[in-house]
Amino acid sequence: MWKEFKEFAFKGNIIDLAVAVVIGGAFGAIVTSFVENIITPLMGVIVGGVDFTTLKVTVGEAEILYGNFIQSFVDFIIIAFSIFLAIKFLVKFKRQKEEEEVEAVVEELSKQEELLTEIRDLLKEQSNKN
């Protein structure tokens, strides 16, 4: 049982997932700070100094805190956009690296083709002399 657990726990995918969760948490903290400390105050200035988190409607004794919802929605949009940009950058970087590898393989094949062509021509010359 211990052996099976060890094999499961130390597979590459599990470790990659653990690293992704830790990095994602750190990234989330950065984005949250960015939203709370930069975006929210700027939006407050744009809409006339309003702090979204304090916006509410009182109905009887109940308070509907729609400002918190607006803030959560803004946080979500910014986090989603940040993740989109990060993934887009990583995909572009990966694609560029793959293209470079393909170009290297094509270049290598071209050299091989050139050598094979030279060998073929030399063999033709030798067979024509005989």
Swiss-Prot record:
GO terms for cellular component: plasma membrane. It is found in: Cell membrane. One of its GO terms (molecular function) is mechanosensitive monoatomic ion channel activity. PROSITE patterns: MSCL. It is a multi-pass membrane protein. The keyword Ion transport applies. The keyword rRNA-binding does not apply. Keywords: Cell membrane, Ion channel, Ion transport, Membrane, Transmembrane, Transmembrane helix, Transport. Gene3D superfamilies: Large-conductance mechanosensitive channel, MscL, domain 1. The chain crosses the membrane at residues 14-34, 73-93. InterPro entries: Mechanosensitive_channel_CS, MS_channel, MSC/AndL, MscL_channel. Channel that opens in response to stretch forces in the membrane lipid bilayer. May participate in the regulation of osmotic pressure changes within the cell. Homopentamer. NCBIfam families: mscL, PRK00567.1-4, PRK13955.1. Belongs to the MscL family. HAMAP family: MscL. PANTHER family: LARGE-CONDUCTANCE MECHANOSENSITIVE CHANNEL, MECHANOSENSITIVE CHANNEL MSCL. This is Large-conductance mechanosensitive channel. The gene is mscL.
